[in-house]
UniProtKB/Swiss-Prot annotation:
Entry's localization field: Secreted; Fimbrium
Name used for this protein in its record: PRS fimbrial minor pilin protein
Gene Ontology annotations of biological process type: cell adhesion involved in single-species biofilm formation
Primary site of residence: secreted
UniProtKB keywords: Disulfide bond, Fimbrium, Secreted, Signal
Gene Ontology CC annotation, any one: extracellular region
Entries under InterPro entries matching the protein: Adhesion_dom_fimbrial_sf, Adhesion_dom_sf, Bact_Fimbrial_Adh_Pro
Functional summary from the UniProt entry: Fimbriae (also called pili), polar filaments radiating from the surface of the bacterium to a length of 0.5-1.5 micrometers and numbering 100-300 per cell, enable bacteria to colonize the epithelium of specific host organs. Seems to anchor the pilus to the bacterial cell. In addition the stoichiometric relationship between PrsH and PrsA determines the pilus length.
Signal peptide feature range: 1-22
Disulfide-bond pairs as recorded: C58-C97
Family affiliation: Belongs to the fimbrial protein family.
Length: 195
């Protein structure tokens, strides 16, 4: 009994030592059928591959990613006499847009949606301004007159070409509180979703 017990232990020890000090198996540049011969390789196997062909999204023109828009100076009397003050135009320019198409015809689902993020003003269609000025908020409208709401997706804009300019208007609007002179600023983010 002792002889049978010690032989297997010795055998496994040799295999372990041999495995530690042996080179790579099979040798580099040689497959198992080459190493053992075709007739000795008997296992079956399967390789599964998968992937996806995608339409890349439009890219934003880098100079439009970070914009500083100077609203200028506005006399308090200009705001006292009306609901809104100065307006400034700005654009988000898209590049390298690819569309759903067949034979050069665009399908109706080639469009984008823009969401502006910022601190909500006194009403959902306005953005809060920081600084010393009081009684005013910021409002954003697209080229079709749709007003942006903080964190809400704006209506879809159909894409018609490889390069698109999404035009918007920023305006200073009264928020119903007492007007006070001073500086103001806001930092707004935006997200472009491509369909």
């Amino acid at each position: 009994m002792r002889l049978r017990f010690s032989v297997p232990l010795f055998f496994f020890g040799c295999v372990f030592v041999h495995g530690v000090f042996a080179g790579p198996f099979p040798p580099p540049g040689m497959s198992l059928p080459e190493y053992w011969g075709e007739e000795h390789v008997w296992w079956d196997g399967r390789a599964t591959f998968h992937g996806e062909v995608v339409r890349p999204a439009c890219t934003l023109a880098m100079e439009d990613a970070w914009q500083i828009i100077d609203m200028g100076e506005t006399p308090v009397r200009d705001l006292q006499n009306g609901f809104s003050g100065p307006e400034r135009k700005f654009s988000l320019r898209l590049r390298n847009c690819e569309f759903n198409s067949q034979g050069g015809n665009l399908f109706s689902d080639s469009r984008i949606r823009v969401t502006f993020d910022g601190v909500r003003g006194e009403t959902p269609d306005k953005f809060n301004l920081s600084g010393q000025a009081k009684g005013i908020n910021l409002q954003i409208a697209d080229a079709r007159g749709n007003i942006a709401r903080a964190g809400k997706v704006m209506p879809a804009i159909p894409l018609t070409g490889n390069e698109e300019a999404l035009d918007y208007t920023l305006r200073i609007v009264r928020n119903g509180k007492k007007l006070e002179a001073g500086n103001y600023f806001a930092v707004l983010g935006f997200r472009v979703d491509y369909e």
